[in-house]
Structure formats: structure tokens, C-alpha cells
Amino acid sequence: MKRTKLLPLLLSALLLLSASGCRPAEAPSQSGGASSSVSSSTSSSGIPAPNDEVLPIDLAVLSGPTGVGAAYLMEYYAPEHVPADSPISVSSVVVTENSEATALLSNGEADIAAVATNVASNFYHKTDGSIQMLAVNTMGVLYILEKGDSIQSMADLRGKTIYASGKGNTPEYALNYVLTQNGIDPASDVTIEWKSEQAECLSALMAEENTIAMLPQPFVTTAQTKSENIRVALDLTEEWDEIQAESDAPSTLVTGVVVGRTEFVAEHPEAVSAFLEHYRASVEYVNANVDEAAQLVGQYEIVAAEVAQKALPECNIVFIEGVEMKDSLSGYLSVLFEQNPKSVGGALPDDAFYYSR
């Protein structure tokens, strides 16, 4: 009789142990210290119990490096997984073009978005301040690749043809800046073949020997996976930093940022603060747990999992907010403005552009 009563208890204990072994790796705590659990309050059916105090946030992220840092947040703070103690849930969508993200912000279908840096500045001016800059999430990820061994410095690009994508955005302005600062006129000293997609640049690079292309991660990793003869000739972030080292107020190359609708930020400051803490923890998790993060990144089609596995350590994923964010962004946008005022929307953003909690 006693054995009959003990059997259900033993089975229950085994089930609990089994369930605990299947939980995902935990993200770093939002304070950067001990880990925080991603488990949620559940009913007897296993479905997360409803929490009337949870504020839903709609998030749009750009595929590629700009969206990578949000992968953990997108999975474990989704409405069906949100922890019981979280004041927010996050419903996310991945887009392939900046214009898709800004359209979602415009019509209120997205509250927060991860987009290219200069796109954020342009959109701010175009919409009379309808968004605010919340954080920097991606630093420089641009590289000059070569199927050969002739490019050892920026000077070696003179007279060459460079395949590139991203005309009118960060890639064009970054390339033009480092070329110009090295005494190379982008309009006459080199030939830049602008392609509509990174995949076209990759195809051109693969086609014949001594081809040169500018590519961002994770396409750099993809290229080197396809051919052992393709090498990284120049790191544009390093070239940028070398130029800026002599400046009175050095800037750095900033590829991606997180922005929020100004109205939403003003109405829900506590929710925005919670989101930023979760985002910080997500970035820490992605950088510290490459294998697990690569699977999440692939699951959400931000970057293919097998590529993300190798590329994540090179994607320069960060979380920078507040004064440090403003300093890095204002310096970077100033460099773009000096090249072409239209690149940042015709004027540098005012202080209201930069959110600080």
C-alpha cells in the first residue's frame, strides 16, 4: 500500500527534474550580475498565466547584424513566454528593409525598432521628431574583401573596382569617408559598382580572381565559407578609428541603433526602461552564448543559424545608452553631415533626439 502511494510521487519528481533539465541557458541579469530565470508563471495546463499588468510592446528589427542582439529578447519575452515578473511582453517582426521598419513606426504597428543609424536620423527629421534614439546596438561591421592578395592598405584601392551594396546608407558614407581621408576620390580614383543586394556583391566576388567587394558581416563569413581564397583585406572600422584618432572629439563607426516612437516613450517611461534592461541582457546573452544564440537568430530568420554560428563573434553587437550613446552617435552623424547633409536628413538631430532615462 505504501509503495502504491509513493509511486505517483516518484513519477512527479522525475517529471520535474526532466523539465528543469530542458530549460534554455539563462541570460545575464539585467544588472550584469547573477543570472535571471526566463521561466514564466503557468497554469496547470502549462500555458503562461495571464498578467493584466503586462504592457505589450511591438518590436520591428532589421535582419542582419542590427537585429541579432534582440534574439533572446524576442524569444523569451514573447507573450507566450514572458516571465511572471516582467512588466512588458514583446511581439516582434523581422524585416529586410529599413523602409519596412520605418513604415511600421509611422502607422503605429511598431513601438520600437532596430534600424540603420542614418535612417533613424533621416526619419527623425522627416517626421518632425516622431522617434527618439534609445540605444546603439551595432558598431562597425563593414570589411573590404578580396579574392587575391593585392590589397594591403587603403592606398592599394586606387584604380580598382569595388563591388558594394547600400548606396544612400551607412555603407556608402563609410566607404566614401575612409577613401577621401586617405586621399582617394570615390568619384574618380576608384570605380564603385553599386548592387541592390549583398548577395550580388558576393556573387561578383566569387566569379573571378582579384575581385574586390565591400561586405558586412555575416556576408563576410558566408564568403569565406564558400571559398578559402577570399580574405579580409581591410577592416573599415579600424580604418575609421585610425583616421579619427587625431580628431579633437573622436567618433566611431555606428551601424545600427534602437529607436522608439516619441509618443510611446513619453506615455510609458517605465515600460521603456524595462525594455532597455531586457535588451541589455539579451545582448549580453547573445555575446556570451554563441551556440545557443545562433539557433535563435536562425529561428527568427535574422541570420541563417549556420552562418551566425561563425559570424556572431565578429558582428560587433553592443548595448550603449545615455550620455555614451549620444557622444558616439553625435560624432558619427557629424562626420556623415560633413560629407553630405542629406545623409542625416539635412541637419544634425537636436538634443531631443537622444533619449536618456
Predicted regions and their residues:
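Short, solvent-exposed loop/beta-turn-alpha elements that line the ligand-binding surface or hinge
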Residues: A78-I88, E238-S251, I317-K326
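Short, surface-exposed acidic
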Residues: P186-V190, E301-P313, S343-D350
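Conserved C-terminal helix/tail region of periplasmic/extracytoplasmic solute-binding proteins
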Residues: S330-R357
